[in-house]
Amino acid sequence: MKKIVVFLLLVSSLFPSGCTRPKQYADYSRHSCFDRTEIDSATLRNLEVLGRVWGFVKYHHPAFSDDRYDLDFELFELLPLVADTAPAARNEILAQWIDGFGRYKTASEKYEKILASDSVFEHRTDIGWIRDTATLGRELSERLVRLRSADRTAGNRYVSQTYYETYDQWSPNPCFDGEKPYYDLSNPDYGYRLLTVFRFWNMVEYFFPSKYLTDKDWNDVLPEYIRRMAHPTGSYLRETRRMIAELDDNHAQYGGGIFELFGRYRVPLNTGFVEGRLIVVTPDTVPVKSERKAPFQVGDEIVAVEDKPVEYYMAQTREFISCSNENDVLAATADQILRTKENRPL
């Protein structure tokens, strides 16, 4: 009897009261098992609803305070179920999916008090879409509305709050250190591409206070890139860089895809736009040991690169550059114009 008691105590210490084992998933580590090259309007709408609901649940449900669930793999399970189904069936699947994470407590009074405070940001996220019963149906809408008031005191594994010093004070900043990077996926399938879109769009939707300043309505970005990522000739890095540039923010920079888009090599010149013309602004930086005369001088104007006018390259590069004003766009464009995919002498 003593041996049995000791064994039971040992087991209870390994699995404390209230602890739930992590959910077991299929192996999605390299493939989402969901791929498309074309999507029609009905599938696009289903995926847009899924992306919104998935992101809202991700940042509002208390079940994600620990590592019991993997939201990336949850998405991969949902994609084949939702993509081609009728709206009513889609909504039922998503409502049942939310129910599967279990019960939770709400803290409505606490949140209402915060929202009534004068310190709340004027342009906070508009989540009125969760009450759209015409699109979501009554049951799914009710679950999302209740989820808004869920008690999230335990935190969220996918986002935490960190602080950085600015103007002699500490300012809060979201830190997405709970996301898996998937470094080995250089050419991900459509499911993983959608994961990129859904992750990024929802990060901006809930944590980027300047999204109302972008040139393009942020609500239009989600369906656009759901469609773009499905295109068979669309480069993943190319579309990711284009999507990030939609923020029109100098801080939104992504190094991936620079070589693929603009070339690995660069003409050794520093240039800038002066009155709309591409001008050499510092001397030629070719090493002295080349023993040749520098082909460019300060003040020279570059009118074409490889027989194509500068205006052509401006049009090609502009959509991949994230800057908040025209001067910064031109400065970044000047650098990219002189890149090339071939290594050859001037």
Describe each PLM feature range.
Residues 20-346:
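Flexible, low-complexity junctional segments that flank or bridge functional domains
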Residues 1-24:
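Bacterial Sec-dependent N-terminal signal peptides
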